Amino acid sequence: YMGSGTSLVEASIKGINAIGTDLNPLARLMSHVKTTHYDLSCIRDTFSMMQALFFEYSEDKVKNKNFDNISNYTYWYSRDSLLRLSYIYQVINECVALDFADFFKVPLSETVREVSFTRNGEFKRFRMKEEKIKDFKPDVFRLFEEKVIRNINGLEEFNSIKYPCNIGIYDFNSTIEIPSDIIQPNSVDMVVTSPPYGDSRTTVAYGQFSRWANEWFNFENAKTLDNLLMGGRVQKEELFETKSI
């Protein structure tokens, strides 16, 4: 469970070979972007082009107005936010070079949650009270742009520290099997994992927190992710034997 890939970034800036795995496609996207040395000049030029297109926005320029892939979208979003989010995604898909698209999907993944009617500071989905919703009018483009600028600053710092190393990002379930073709036995010097916490489905709601972006990007298992993560399903028999420390 590599989460947002912070451990992989730290390994990268120290020149340490590292492998991360996560069943959550959003976690893999974020980890990939955070450990990639993008061309800073190209990213900045692309962002300037996107900002110009945002300035030209109008509702009739939004091509995809079908939001059926988003659970209860009228409950969680205003129509204006839905259209502007769709326009940003459209610009990324149609106008951004494929090599740089993921870089801009990461700030969009944050924006889709922040402009929704979900309460701030919650991992689980809890809707704002009606009186707050009436006054909630997020500036979708500005929020997205602020996150892009923050990430560009982070990229500039990351690019200033380059050491030769290999970073691998995978989706295998380490509680079931660690593929020997990816990680050979006795080849790992250190394992970094999260501290113990409750199961994902009822306690941490890791999948619920990620579901906003996973649905927007049409990632596989977006609606059932918590069932696939730790504690999502009860196992009636041991999957493998472990040795005591």
Briefly describe each language-model feature range.
Residues T36-H37, N186, G207-W212:
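Glycine-rich, phosphate-binding/catalytic loops in enzymes
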